[in-house]
Swiss-Prot record:
GO cellular component, one term: cytosol
Membrane-crossing residue ranges in chain numbering: none
Stretch forming the signal peptide: none
Region annotated Adenylyl transferase, chain positions: 450-947
One Pfam family, short name: GlnE
Region (Adenylyl removase): 1-440
InterPro entries hit by this protein: GlnE, GlnE_rpt_dom, NT_sf, PII_UdlTrfase/GS_AdlTrfase
PANTHER family in alphabetical order: BIFUNCTIONAL GLUTAMINE SYNTHETASE ADENYLYLTRANSFERASE_ADENYLYL-REMOVING ENZYME, GLUTAMINE SYNTHETASE ADENYLYLTRANSFERASE
Protein name, UniProt field: Bifunctional glutamine synthetase adenylyltransferase/adenylyl-removing enzyme
Keywords for the protein's UniProt record, in alphabetical order: ATP-binding, Magnesium, Multifunctional enzyme, Nucleotide-binding, Nucleotidyltransferase, Transferase
Any GO MF annotation of the entry: [glutamate-ammonia-ligase] adenylyltransferase activity
Keyword Mitochondrion recorded: no
């Protein structure tokens, strides 16, 4: 055993002062001295439980003792009679065994592969032990879940990630997926439940038993987000539902995750074999699957973006050459060739590396270096986490913990450890880059083209200086370009740029100037790019991105030239520069039906319990998607209708995620309203009005929302902090508003306006569905019924959605007096025009002035309210274009007029989008759009001016 280093010997005196009663410095072995000096977690644990220290001193932990975990836990749970005592025993057991593992690991009594195995077996033992105890308890309460033939149904648990691979780290989340075989009902209990309800309740209790912090701590943080549909999906799925999902909707990244999936516990029964057989074809293709390479390239980009996005330094998991890259290298071969090569189907990394070597898929030397690097990094990670039982992969900045790690890794000192670590990570990065490949560097021709611009950049030319490379510019443009460069250099002098940053900037600027100054709009483009560069000069990683990826630089120049809005966004949020790396996705927005799934995948990388990171991630995802939509808009690959469709689908995905986050937080605090025990869903809906309801969002639109619930009176929540059910939904809505409006370093998510709710700002923030129906029928004004024309549920369970749709249909199909309706709609429009219309007589406000967008919207709303009692089909859609179609199809408006209004509407909307991209207000010269305005005004007179 390596003697303690000097800093640790000094720290030992602090440890001695904290030793539990009955233990002295002389009574402890050298082994105990080493472990307690190294790990505060071990020290705190034996202070609380001195008998554990005596146990360890008398008999050291053994390599194969994981075989006894299940028996030991069974003994510990023998006297457990309720959930509270179960939770206490699980926490004690986990802590006791973790101290034993920390002891063995610190002293190298057991090799590092075995440590990973012990950590994984411990987690599996605790998961299975808790599941089995709770299954029996639930069966006593509700009966045994059976299929129609009376065969009892088990809860099967898939361990994902490192747990599935038998490679769990010391302080880790556990990723789980719950499943049960067949539908049916419980039998033999005090009350019957269908199997879905039984297993959902069992799953909820199991998560609580493992995850909920108590005075004794927690067992594991449980992450269920890898299940089908993530947080918005059922907690537990039947085999049939799982099979349907993975066959019809399974994504590439879910396939990657499923490579490591392993059933927990005794898994050789018929149900387990059936589930494995069902999942295998989804994971491993029968053919050599080279189609996966592009997806893997995208994953590589995601790793790099995550490191930049989170500002990760000294991170041995996510940094360049870290653990994640080794896992990625191995997965490349598993996913491409695993279907044809059974030896590649192992869930564990090291056996798969052996198979890669045996199949000669990588050179032997590369495999050997990856193996050594992996074991080195995993030991370093586990030692780091065992100091405080803390989930971290970032190297410490303090001297004590650095000394601890150097000693634990058998290095002479911290610099030696860092040197070894750097060598290992460089080896990994080399293999990683060779396997996937990076963008090509500059060609010799590009270098030659940019060389003359080096003089312009480095010699700080004055306004009146001449240089051949600027000769093609007009005199005024040349002066402005030189002024912009000079001002930029002065700005740089105020910034604390390190030597590496200046080196990269000097490398980047000649290329940038060569590209920008070859454009006719060089002055405008350079004026937009220099503020962005000034914002990132102290963040070398972004300068390197633009310098090392010429394609990204070209896209940056093109987009900034086209849109000051995009230039402003990139300057404000430099992490968006990552999006420029892949033109395949930059100009091709996410499919309209895939935003929820993309966001779910994005959020999986963020700890579920870290609210601040969750808020940041939501905002960063939105900004990245907005950039892609705007880029496609500029490139002309998205027509106006599609731009709004994408912006609307994106907003709906964000609403879904925000509600999920708020719901999780509220349920953790209060439990859920008890009426949900008798029904599926959450009894909650979000209704979108205005542009969101009408599929017509713009780049900077806010969201008009109202919130509904169906909670009866006198219902309470079922959590430890019990509150009234309706109060729960009010707090849920308040939480949602807070999550939308909180300003982080990435800004707010959306401005949300909830004033369209019953009684406006004076009304309750969340309304029961019955009260909403009553208000609409007896109290609402005509303008509120107009607003309802453009309303639809954007989040909600089917039951509440149907209820809202029925109320909306009833209100809209109510027979109205035509003259009265015409007068009320016209007068409301005149009031709006007086308040919101353009005050500049020489300008036309595209939205608010006569002949503008709002007039078209009012015509459509008036005609629906006027004629829907005769033609109920008019209530089907909430967007203006399809309402105009319906008016023509149902004989209310002739085809020519409907088509002409549609063209006018989309033309005006298109102009608004493009003005937004130019950061210009929504008005134009009076001479613009005269044809469209005349047409709209004629239609307005026809329908809404009294004859």
């Amino acid at each position: 055993m390596t003697p303690l280093s000097s800093p640790l010997s000094q720290y030992w005196q602090t440890v001695v002062e904290r030793l539990p009663e009955g233990f002295t410095e002389t009574s402890l072995s050298a082994q105990a001295k080493s472990v307690l000096t190294f790990s505060d977690f071990a020290l705190d644990s034996v202070i609380a439980h001195p008998e554990w220290l005596a146990e360890l001193e008398s008999a050291s932990p053994q390599a194969d003792e994981w075989r006894h975990y299940a028996g030991w836990l069974q003994e510990a749970l023998a006297g457990v009679c309720d959930d509270a005592s179960l939770m206490r025993e699980l926490r004690f057991f986990r802590r006791r065994i973790m101290v034993r593992i920390a002891w063995a690991q610190t002293l190298s009594l057991v090799d590092d592969e075995t440590i990973l195995q012990q950590l994984s077996h411990l987690a599996e033992t605790l998961i299975v032990g808790a599941r089995d105890w709770l299954y029996a308890a639930c069966c006593r309460e509700w009966g045994t879940p059976c299929n129609p033939q009376g065969v009892p149904q088990p809860l099967l648990i898939l361990g994902m990630g490192k747990l599935g691979g038998g490679e769990l780290n010391f302080s880790s989340d556990i990723d789980l997926i719950f499943a049960w075989p067949e539908h049916g009902e419980t039998r033999g209990g005090r009350r019957e439940l269908d199997n879905a309800q039984f297993f959902t309740r069992l799953g909820q209790r199991l998560i609580k038993a493992l995850d909920q912090p108590t005075m004794d701590g927690f067992v594991y943080r449980v992450d269920m987000r890898l299940r089908p549909f993530g947080d918005s999906g059922p907690l537990v799925l039947s085999f049939a539902a799982l099979e349907d999902y993975y066959q019809e909707q399974g994504r590439d990244w879910e396939r990657y995750a499923m490579v490591k999936a392993r059933l927990m516990g005794d898994n050789d029964d018929a149900w387990s074999r059936e589930l494995r057989a069902m999942l295998r074809p989804f994971v491993f293709r029968r053919y050599i699957d080279f189609s996966v390479i592009q997806s893997l390239r995208n994953m590589k980009g995601m790793i790099a973006r995550e490191v930049r996005r989170r500002g990760l330094k000294d991170n041995i998991k996510l940094g360049a050459g870290g653990i994640r890259e080794i896992e990625f290298i191995v997965q490349v071969f598993q996913l491409i060739r695993g279907g044809r090569e059974p030896s590649l189907q192992s869930r564990s990394l090291l056996p798969t590396l052996d198979a890669i070597a045996a199949l000669h898929l990588l050179p032997e030397n590369d495999v050997a270096q990856l193996r050594v690097a992996y074991l080195f990094l995993r030991r370093l990670e586990n030692l780091l986490q065992s100091i405080n039982d803390e989930q971290t992969q970032t190297l410490p900045a303090d001297d004590l913990n650095r000394a601890r790690l150097a000693w634990g890794m058998k290095a002479e000192n911290w610099p030696q450890l860092v040197g070894e670590l750097t060598d290992h990570m460089a080896n990994v990065r080399r293999v990683f880059n060779e396997l996937i490949g990076d963008d090509e560097a500059d060609t010799p021709q590009e270098e030659e083209r940019s060389e003359p611009w080096r003089e312009v950049w480095q010699d700080a030319l004055q306004e009146d200086d001449s240089t051949p490379v600027l000769a093609h510019l007009a005199d005024e443009d040349r002066r402005q370009v030189l002024t912009l460069i000079a001002d930029f250099r002065k700005e740089l002098d105020k910034r604390p740029i390190g030597p590496r940053g200046r080196q990269v900037l000097d490398q980047l600027m000649p290329h940038l100037l060569a590209d920008v100054c070859s454009r006719e709009d060089a002055v405008v483009t350079l004026s937009r790019i220099t503020p962005l560069l000034a914002g990132i000069v102290t963040r070398t990683t972004y300068l390197e991105l633009l310098s090392e990826f010429p394609g990204a630089l070209k896209h940056l120049i093109m987009l900034c030239a086209a849109s000051p809005m995009i230039a402003s966004q990139l300057a404000r949020y430099p992490l968006l520069l990552d999006e420029l790396l892949d033109p395949g996705t930059l100009y091709q927005p996410t499919a309209t039906d895939a935003y929820r799934d993309e966001l779910r995948q994005y959020l999986l990388r963020v700890p579920e319990e870290d609210e601040e990171q969750q808020l940041e991630a939501l905002r960063q995802f939105k900004q990245a998607q907005l950039l892609r939509i705007a880029a496609a808009d500029i490139a002309g690959t998205l027509p106006v209708m599609k731009v709004s469709d994408h912006l609307t689908w994106l907003a709906e995905a964000m609403i879904d995620a925000v509600v999920q986050q708020a719901w999780t937080q509220m349920v953790a605090r209060y439990g859920q309203p008890a009426h949900l025990d008798e029904r599926q869903g959450r009894g909650f809906a979000v209704v979108g009005y205005g542009k969101l309801g009408g599929w017509e969002l713009g780049y900077s639109s806010d969201l008009d929302l109202i919130f509904l619930h169906d909670c009866p009176m006198d219902v309470m929540t079922n959590g430890e902090r019990e509150i009234d059910g309706r109060q729960f939904y009010l707090r849920l809505a308040q939480r949602i508003m807070h999550l939308f409006s909180t300003r982080t370093s990435s800004g707010i998510l959306y401005e949300v306006d909830a004033r369209l709710r019953p009684s406006g700002a004076a009304g309750m923030l969340v309304t029961s569905a019955d009260a909403f129906a009553d208000y609409q029928q007896h109290e609402a004004w005509t303008w509120e019924h107009q607003a309802l024309v453009r309303a639809r549920v954007v989040y909600g369970d089917p039951q509440l959605t149907s209820q809202f749709d029925a109320v909306r249909r009833t209100i809209m199909t109510t027979a109205r007096d035509g003259k009265t309706l015409q007068t009320e709609v016209r007068e409301m429009r005149e009031k709006m025009r007086a308040h919101l219309g353009n005050k500049h007589r020489d300008r036309f406000d595209i939205k608010a002035d006569e002949g503008g967008i709002t007039d078209i919207e009012f015509i459509a709303q008036y005609l629906v309210l006027r004629y829907a009692h005769e033609k109920p089909k008019l209530t089907r859609w909430s967007d203006n274009v399809r309402i105009l179609e319906l008016l023509a199809q149902n004989g209310i408006m002739d085809d020519h007029e409907a088509q002409a209004l549609t063209v006018a509407y989309t033309t005006l909307r298109d102009e608004l989008h493009h003005l937004a991209l130019q950061e210009l207000p929504g008005h134009v010269a009076q001479t613009c759009f005269s044809k469209e305005r005349a047409l709209v005004q004629a239609s307005w007179r026809k329908w809404l001016v009294a004859v």
